[in-house]
Amino acid sequence: MKKIAVLTSGGDAPGMNAAVRAVVRKAMYYDIEVYGVYQGYQGLINNNIKKMERGTVGDKIQRGGTFLQSARCPEFKDPEVRKQAIANLNNLGIEGLVVIGGDGSYRGAQRLNEEGIKTIGIPGTIDNDINGTDFTIGFDTALNTIVEAIDKIRDTASSHERTFIVEVMGRDAGDLALWSGLAGGAETVLCPEHRKDVKVIADKIQQGIERGKKHSIIVVAEGVMTGEECGQELKKYINVDTRISVLGHMQRGGSPSGMDRVLASRLGGYAVELLMNDETGLAVGIQNNSLSKTKFEDIFTSVHHLDEKMYELSNELSI
């Protein structure tokens, strides 16, 4: 393989730049030309493809976001649109493509693979909701961002004896809510996988008040309900002073953590190795701290599961 390309797609995640850097540097080490596709699949369609040099990825490993930029591209589902994207790659002699993103990005990569472009997927999303890997690029950084916010919110919650509801990302997966709730000592965590009755939460807070507890933190994943909705429901059962904190897109930003930089570097390098070995239609991952590879179709046919033992522990420690 003489030429490959790399793109980032879907929601940005801290560490994507580190993954791009690893792909570029690893490929160049083996004298493979690398092209960067700007603005994700939209860039493939628009032929926004540029040759990368070693210096192109210099001073990028510590930067958040993605310098290749990203864009949603629903029209990529259209076979005629993909034909144009494939033609653009073929005209440049590009044989392989590395796609960094989430589930939707993987589906685009799978279609390209079926249509003749050798593809490898790298999991890049803060939600940690992709099968075939224990952790996704960006999850650790987002987790640290949320925990830092919870720590600061707890200071003011304690000062004013309030109940704070912290809304975090996670439409279908509760990993961010669970992990940040456990690390931040939250009194209650609401995950899409475990939809608690708000009355149960209210009873728990009331029991804490009766024991002398002056403040509480509730972490709710956006896929369960909004923080505002949670607060309104809570007031139906208990008279507490509540405040809502929606962390929003700040969870996606910031310099990637050391763990995310290392993970991204390992996965980026491994993706190039697979293409060099003519292996394709695969997503790379990390399982039990070892590099792994999974067929795209196997990722789509399995369901992401919350760590139930950790969920039980969170409940046990939040009495």
UniProtKB/Swiss-Prot annotation:
GO cellular component, one term: 6-phosphofructokinase complex
Protein residues bound to substrate: 125-127, 162, 169-171, 222, 243, 249-252
Catalytic activity: beta-D-fructose 6-phosphate + ATP = beta-D-fructose 1,6-bisphosphate + ADP + H(+)
Entry's Gene Ontology molecular function annotations: 6-phosphofructokinase activity; AMP binding; ATP binding; fructose-6-phosphate binding; identical protein binding; metal ion binding; monosaccharide binding
Biological-process GO terms, alphabetical: canonical glycolysis; fructose 1,6-bisphosphate metabolic process; fructose 6-phosphate metabolic process
Entry annotated with the keyword Transferase: yes
Major location (coarse): cytoplasm
Cofactor requirement: Mg(2+)
Residues bound to ADP: 21-25, 154, 185-187, 211, 213-215
Binding positions (Mg(2+)): 103
Family: Belongs to the phosphofructokinase type A (PFKA) family. ATP-dependent PFK group I subfamily. Prokaryotic clade 'B1' sub-subfamily.
Stated role: Catalyzes the phosphorylation of D-fructose 6-phosphate to fructose 1,6-bisphosphate by ATP, the first committing step of glycolysis.
Subunit-level organization: Homotetramer.
Protein name: ATP-dependent 6-phosphofructokinase
The species this protein was found in: Macrococcus caseolyticus (strain JCSC5402) (Macrococcoides caseolyticum)
